[in-house]
């Protein structure tokens, strides 16, 4: 890789990382807006992970990404002391704890939707009167229902009330947001498997044992997992959820860079072993 191509590659890579940091703010703004409807009595400490699962998840994933970038690209093997290596492992372990916790936040959102019940005695939204009702536009988006806009949300005749909330949605909308919640859960679960494999890859590469059958199984598994993640991104794109679509593709690019780092790291180790063997044979 020439110097110019090297600079362009790194500029593109760190631009992707910076955009992912921006997404932390975008998801927080989305979660904050939804929390005013989801938690009408205020967000209690126990509600934080459910109400802000996206923002917490994205923030910790960015930290985890930077940890992998440090070990696989920025820090040279010769300059990584045992203390630095242990520190990176501990930081990543803490990130994994929070990521698993966030996964249960996505699961809680899905289970919450299962509690939606038919709103009896209501055949159109305008009949709800002047009470503080909101329409569930998306998984994390609510719109206040007023006399001026009540007829614009849905022409359905059957509506569902979300458990414990003055928020309603029609049958088609409930199906859509439930499917989106399923995709969130599947996406989060698959990413957990991806990062588990990547952690194993890094640990084996540290010991120069990332080769043979283990290497082939890792590559095959990640091919399947990344394909599922790509399908999730496409689904969000089809459903018009731009932020999730955009975020999903950025993460695929970001971890493609980490995979390239691991490949180059392995190649450097092989070249070093070959050079050492050649020197010893002279």
What positions do the PLM features span?
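Transmembrane alpha-helical segments of multi-pass membrane proteins
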Residues: 13, 83-99, 213-229
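C-terminal transmembrane-bundle signature of multipass membrane proteins
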Residues: 17-25, 190-207, 223-278
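Juxtamembrane membrane-water interface segments of multi-pass membrane proteins
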Residues: 2, 70-86, 111, 198-214, ...
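N-terminal membrane topogenic signal
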Residues: 1-15
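Membrane-helix interface and helix-disruption motif detector
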Residues: 45-56, 111-114, 178-186, 236-247
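Central hydrophobic cores of alpha-helical transmembrane segments in multi-pass inner-membrane proteins
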Residues: 58-74
């Amino acid at each position: 890789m020439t110097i110019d191509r090297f600079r362009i590659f790194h500029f593109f890579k760190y631009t992707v990382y910076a955009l992912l940091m921006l997404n932390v703010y975008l998801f927080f703004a989305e979660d904050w807006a939804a929390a005013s409807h989801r938690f009408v009595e205020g967000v209690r400490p126990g509600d934080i992970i459910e109400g802000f699962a996206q923002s917490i998840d994205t923030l910790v994933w960015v930290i985890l990404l930077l940890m992998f970038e440090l070990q696989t690209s920025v820090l040279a093997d010769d300059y990584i002391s045992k203390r630095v290596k242990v520190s990176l492992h501990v930081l990543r372990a803490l990130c994994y704890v929070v990521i698993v916790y966030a996964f249960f936040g996505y699961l809680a959102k899905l289970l919450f939707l299962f509690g939606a019940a038919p709103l009896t005695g209501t055949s159109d939204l305008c009949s709800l009167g002047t009470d503080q009702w909101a329409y569930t536009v998306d998984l994390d988006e609510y719109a206040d229902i007023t006399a001026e806009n009540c007829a614009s949300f849905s022409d359905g005749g059957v509506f569902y009330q979300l458990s414990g909330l003055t928020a309603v949605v029609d049958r088609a909308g409930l199906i859509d947001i439930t499917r989106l919640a399923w995709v969130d859960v599947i996406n989060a679960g698959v990413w957990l498997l991806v990062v588990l494999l990547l952690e194993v890859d890094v640990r084996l590469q540290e010991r120069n044992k990332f080769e043979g059958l283990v290497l082939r199984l890792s590559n095959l598994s990640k091919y399947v997992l990344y394909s599922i993640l790509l399908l999730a991104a496409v689904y969000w794109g089809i459903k018009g959820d731009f932020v999730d679509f955009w975020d999903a593709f950025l993460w695929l690019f970001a971890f493609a860079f980490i995979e390239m780092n691991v490949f180059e790291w392995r190649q450097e180790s092989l070249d070093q072993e070959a050079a050492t063997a050649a020197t010893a044979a002279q």
